[in-house]
Every structure is written in structure tokens, then in C-alpha cells.
């Protein structure tokens, strides 16, 4: 074995050659610099941000949101888009289903005038557009809605009844191999919305599976299973859904956490309702009968009145949200974010 000084000289020479050929920082020691905090995009639900363990969806990673129809998948994705735009970011939406409702998106806070939208004809076209947008280095978040609608060109141009086994899975595998590195380099979050299917002949375990093969399961840093569990009513009228999100996979924090939040028809995720739920759960908000109080002041009688009070007092809502996240140790502290994160990619707790 070579002497230690000789080995170190050989390593230094190799590192110098790598830096010269591939650019400075191509290889680094983990201890060389203090690592910047994980940069995130808030989801719009404080319960989901806490369940994710880092305060939102991580930048530079692949995220999969899946579940049954009308469970709130696109709503969660659009809230992430709106929050990225509030941070000054640029967002794109690949509408493979041709079903994006601009009016609904605007109600959720999305700047539809600035949102980049594509309605591709084939899966190849959709993924090529996505690859080019990510490669520009200008995007903060891109949503693909949905994986199931990424139909390969051969299937579209073929006849009904033709067999195209594995085409979509191969397409997804190739695309993810190409984009994963670029996402990390450009700090772009890619959100894939996916649908559920049932496997035939499964007698043990869940028969449910997602479309597009196994590649997305492997490449995704976070997978969120979104389900509608209850209909919210005011009198006889249905006003929204109670939604449960399970973090099925999480490379950034412990997985399998569960979050519940309300989605109000025409308004999206009830941020204020989530703050009240989490505040009560962690002792910041007191509930006595139907009354909710914070620091001796009454928020309102009943959930709807308390929601409305927080909506009319955004400073109080932001303070409660900050206190909840601080108590649970979730999100980036402002001083750390200012010191270590770049202005464009700075994590934001409030929105």
C-alpha cells in the first residue's frame, strides 16, 4: 500500500483534474461547507407540511401525488404552484388530461397570467417539453397532470385494440433518467399527478397500483396518497371534503405520517381550518364547547366562524402558523434561510 502522503497527492491530483475537466465542485467532501437547509415549497396545508417533516415539497426533487378520482390531487399541486409563484418563482403545468380549469386555479391563488401551460398531443411531446423547460434552469415547479394521460405516440397512431405492452412504462423510465439530474441542478420541483388502477387476481394485500410502471416509484423522493374521507356540510348543503394524505415514501424525513385537512369547494385547501386543527392538537388554541380561543381572545364559535376570523386577520393566522411550525421543529428558521439560502430559492414558512 502506498504511503499516506503519496495517496493524498494522488487524490489531490485526481480532484484537480476532475475540477478542470468537469467544473469546480464536481466532487466535494460533505464536511467542506455547512450544508444549506432543505429548500421547500409550502403545500397550502400546515398539516401536510408538518407530515412531510421539512415544511413543504422539496426543491430539486421528484414528487408523486396519487389517489382516486376527485380526491384533491390537482388541488394540492395547484396550491404548491401558487406558493412557488408567491415566492417569486416561475411555474409550468403540463395538462396532458386537457382538463385544467383556469378559473378554479385562480381561486386557489395561482397567477394564471404568468403560469406556463402546455396541452400536448402525445406522451413523448409532453415529456420533451418538460425536459426542455427544466433544462432552461428558469423553472421553480412543474406539474404533470397526469401520468395516466401520457399516451405514447404509437398508441395514438395505432388502431383500437392494438397491444402496446410496456410502452408507457419505458417512456416514463427514459424521461426520469434524463430529468432527475437536471432537477437537482436547477432546483426545480417536478410534481407528477397519478391515477390508481386495480391489479387483477390479487387476493392478498392491496390490489391498487399506479400507472406508468415502476420507475416513478423509484425516482420519487416523496409519494403522497391522497383520499377523500368525509363530505363537509353546512346544513343540508355539501361545502367541501375532509381529505387524508399519507406520506407513503419520504427520502427527506421519516415516512408514513398522515395529515388531514379540509378542501372547500371553489376555495381549495382551507389554510385557516388547518391552523385551527393543528393549534388545538398542540395546545396553542383552546376549544371550549364550540368556542375557539387563542391567548385569551375568542376566535369564534364553531369552525366556520373561526376560519372566517383568521381569514380576516392574516397577521394572526401567520403568527399561529409560525408558532406551530416552531413548536414542531418544521421548516427553515428565517435567520438560517437568510444566511444560507439564495434569495431566489429561500424557503418561506408563511404564504
From Swiss-Prot:
Can catalyze the hydrolysis of ATP in the presence of single-stranded DNA, the ATP-dependent uptake of single-stranded DNA by duplex DNA, and the ATP-dependent hybridization of homologous single-stranded DNAs. It interacts with LexA causing its activation and leading to its autocatalytic cleavage. GO terms for molecular function: ATP binding; ATP hydrolysis activity; ATP-dependent DNA damage sensor activity; damaged DNA binding; single-stranded DNA binding. Signal peptide: none annotated. This is Protein RecA. Belongs to the RecA family. The keyword Nucleotide-binding applies. One of its GO terms (biological process) is SOS response. It comes from the Bacteria. It is found in: Cytoplasm. GO terms for cellular component: cytosol. ATP binds at residues 67-74.
Amino acid at each position: 500500500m502506498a504511503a499516506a502522503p503519496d495517496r493524498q497527492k494522488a487524490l489531490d491530483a485526481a480532484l484537480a483534474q476532475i475540477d478542470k475537466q468537469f467544473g469546480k465542485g464536481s466532487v466535494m467532501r460533505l464536511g467542506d461547507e455547512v450544508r444549506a437547509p432543505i429548500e421547500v415549497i409550502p403545500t397550502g396545508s400546515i398539516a401536510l407540511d408538518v407530515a412531510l417533516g421539512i415544511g413543504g415539497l422539496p426543491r430539486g426533487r421528484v414528487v408523486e401525488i396519487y389517489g382516486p378520482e376527485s380526491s384533491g390531487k390537482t388541488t394540492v399541486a395547484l396550491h404548491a404552484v401558487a406558493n412557488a409563484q408567491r415566492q417569486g418563482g416561475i411555474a409550468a403545468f403540463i395538462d396532458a388530461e386537457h382538463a385544467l380549469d383556469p378559473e378554479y386555479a385562480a381561486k386557489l391563488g395561482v397567477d394564471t397570467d404568468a403560469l406556463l401551460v402546455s396541452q400536448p398531443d402525445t406522451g413523448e411531446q409532453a415529456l420533451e417539453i418538460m425536459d426542455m423547460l427544466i433544462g432552461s434552469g428558469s423553472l421553480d415547479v412543474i406539474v404533470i397532470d397526469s401520468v395516466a394521460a401520457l399516451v405514447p405516440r404509437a398508441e395514438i397512431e395505432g388502431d383500437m385494440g392494438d397491444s402496446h405492452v410496456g410502452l408507457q412504462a419505458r417512456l416514463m423510465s427514459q424521461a426520469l433518467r434524463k430529468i432527475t439530474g437536471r432537477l437537482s441542478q436547477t432546483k426545480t420541483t417536478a410534481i407528477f399527478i397519478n391515477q390508481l388502477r386495480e391489479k387483477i387476481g390479487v387476493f392478498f394485500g392491496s390490489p391498487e397500483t399506479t400507472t406508468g410502471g415502476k420507475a416513478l416509484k423509484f425516482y420519487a423522493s416523496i409519494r403522497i396518497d391522497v383520499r377523500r374521507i368525509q363530505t363537509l356540510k353546512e346544513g343540508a348543503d355539501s361545502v367541501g371534503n375532509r381529505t387524508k394524505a399519507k406520506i407513503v415514501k419520504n427520502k427527506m424525513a421519516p415516512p408514513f405520517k398522515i395529515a388531514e385537512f379540509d378542501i372547500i369547494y371553489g376555495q381549495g385547501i382551507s389554510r385557516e381550518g388547518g391552523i385551527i386543527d393543528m393549534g388545538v392538537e398542540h395546545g396553542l388554541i383552546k376549544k371550549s364547547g364550540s368556542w375557539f380561543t387563542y391567548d385569551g381572545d375568542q376566535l369564534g364559535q364553531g369552525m366556520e366562524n373561526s376560519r372566517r376570523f383568521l381569514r380576516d386577520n392574516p397577521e394572526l393566522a401567520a403568527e399561529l402558523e409560525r408558532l406551530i411550525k416552531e413548536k414542531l421543529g418544521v421548516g427553515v428558521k428565517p435567520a438560517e434561510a437568510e444566511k444560507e439560502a439564495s434569495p431566489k430559492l429561500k424557503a418561506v414558512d408563511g404564504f
